[in-house]
Amino acid sequence: MSKLPRELTRDLERSLPAVASLGSSLSHSQSLSSHLLPPPEKRRAISDVRRTFCLFVTFDLLFISLLWIIELNTNTGIRKNLEQEIIQYNFKTSFFDIFVLAFFRFSGLLLGYAVLRLRHWWVIAVTTLVSSAFLIVKVILSELLSKGAFGYLLPIVSFVLAWLETWFLDFKVLPQEAEEERWYLAAQVAVARGPLLFSGALSEGQFYSPPESFAGSDNESDEEVAGKKSFSAQEREYIRQGKEATAVVDQILAQEENWKFEKNNEYGDTVYTIEVPFHGKTFILKTFLPCPAELVYQEVILQPERMVLWNKTVTACQILQRVEDNTLISYDVSAGAAGGVVSPRDFVNVRRIERRRDRYLSSGIATSHSAKPPTHKYVRGENGPGGFIVLKSASNPRVCTFVWILNTDLKGRLPRYLIHQSLAATMFEFAFHLRQRISELGARA
């Protein structure tokens, strides 16, 4: 297959709508976005990563205390040794000041990051600077080395723990909380600008559409349509899962400037990654296709069960249930990857299909269904929020941009680097087969 012509490459830039704003992406109410990312006053008082940091600070104090007690527990007795180290304190021989230093770190860090919930590094900078300076001076001027192993152990452990706390806060706590806050603000901006769903129906003569799909009136919302049919509790849960997956996909699209480039190929396909709060590393395939968006919508989104005819990365695809016009449950079996090292996996997903002014969207997430319980034949994988997006070109209806967002847990004991390599390779292979399918359909036409 030849590379993309230069003029088609230029069309790529025009075909991708501006996704820097979620205003044209989110199609959900403020209540849904708030459910995904609640406002600060309704979120947990302390994030998981901050709570882990506070536990580590507590461990610092307890560990230093334990080592000090062990040092005090000699033949002369703990009480006599305490009097000698505290009441008859001597800077050169006492370990009491190292315990006080650990308590200083404990009280200062918990006050700043647990009680006051500060989001700045200045508190830990002070505690680490004081700890480091004090320990260096004490090692130089004291006679602790004459006490044997503990003369080495306590200062070294105290120094290492202080710097581990600094690393944990600066590289884990603050960046992750800032990322979650940025996602929340992006969702709030999107909700404020309002949804832009395309409610007009496409004619059946253009391409196949599922029975009663998008058949509601122009002004009907999902809730109004759902109200006309009584859903079971499980069906309502499927609908909710589909909407939540769509909201996360919309937020990922809105963060395109934060996508991290991973690799590309000779056809112009590019794979990016992004860290999504609560879901982890997500892979994104972006490729230009020289065909109308409706054709890709037909082949990839509306008829997933026929994808096995041309997509070699999938060996089986079955629709287990159509919950309502926009929501369905699918069962997929992926082909092996990485030369057979990654064995085939099966997935059960809930999918939500939406048609908008500038794009077609199929988003999904892992779920369970009684028709396909886990079996010994395949390892049951779990997909996080992801899906297919077909972006229309504003200037040329004969071209489009295809985006595949993939967040998956393949389960099994596989090295992380191998999983990442196999996912990127699978995405490139999918794009290759999709391009071949488009060429075949074009030749038939």
UniProtKB/Swiss-Prot annotation:
It is found in: Late endosome membrane. Residues 73-94, 142-148 are extracellular. This is StAR-related lipid transfer protein 3. InterPro entries: MENTAL (IPR019498), StAR-like (IPR000799), STARD3 (IPR051869), STARD3_MLN64_C (IPR029867), START-like_dom_sf (IPR023393), START_lipid-bd_dom (IPR002913). The chain crosses the membrane at residues 52-72, 95-115, 121-141, 149-169. It comes from the Eukaryota. GO terms for molecular function: cholesterol binding; cholesterol transfer activity; protein homodimerization activity. Coiled coil: none annotated. Residues 230-443 form the START domain.
